Amino acid sequence: MKIRVVVLIILAIIIADQGLKIWVKTSMYYGEQINLIGNWFRLFFIENEGMAWGWKFGGEWGKLILTIFRLIAVIFGVFYIRSIVSKNYHRGFIICVCMIFAGALGNLIDSMFYGLIFSRSDDGLPLATMFPPGGGYAGFLHGKVVDMIWMPIIENKTLPTWIPFWGGERFTFFSPIFNIADASISVGVIVILLFQRRFFKKKPHEEHATIETNSQVNDTVQVL
């Protein structure tokens, strides 16, 4: 796979992710919902300070550590992608790594810059604006990640009483609210796990080289 194809894949994901985030941030009130397909596929504007899928991580210091970790991971990802492209890894594996990288970069952009360029979004506040006169709602590396995709396929249903521990309680499936970057990371990881044998299968010339090497070793042992 050529580098320019890799760059196009990454750019496409980041543009889609950031475009939707900016639209939601500036066009929807915090907590507002828009039904896209029935009641099970919605836009639901929230922000989170933590990891993917709304998981939180240790307050302000945790937020800073998480953002720095993301930055290091993205820098490492640049070199790793160059390496697997130059070594001609399986096309599917390269695409999955690009998806994971683009997702990490998409959320990193939020964490690094959104606090600087947007006004605060919260319950009862007006729509957020870009580059507000008084400055953004947070400093560098302390921005909140914008989430908006919610797919409650089963919402607020009561579990049968015979189910241990949770019987009789109400639940929603699928409850996390996420964004395109989160989805890109998750799909990339899942596809790698499902198709790892295909992605890392030895090529015919590598298998032939292994057979020849083993044969040479056996001949040497017999001579000795």
Where do the language-model regions lie?
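Alpha-helical transmembrane bundles and membrane-interface segments of multipass inner-membrane proteins
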Residues: M1-L224
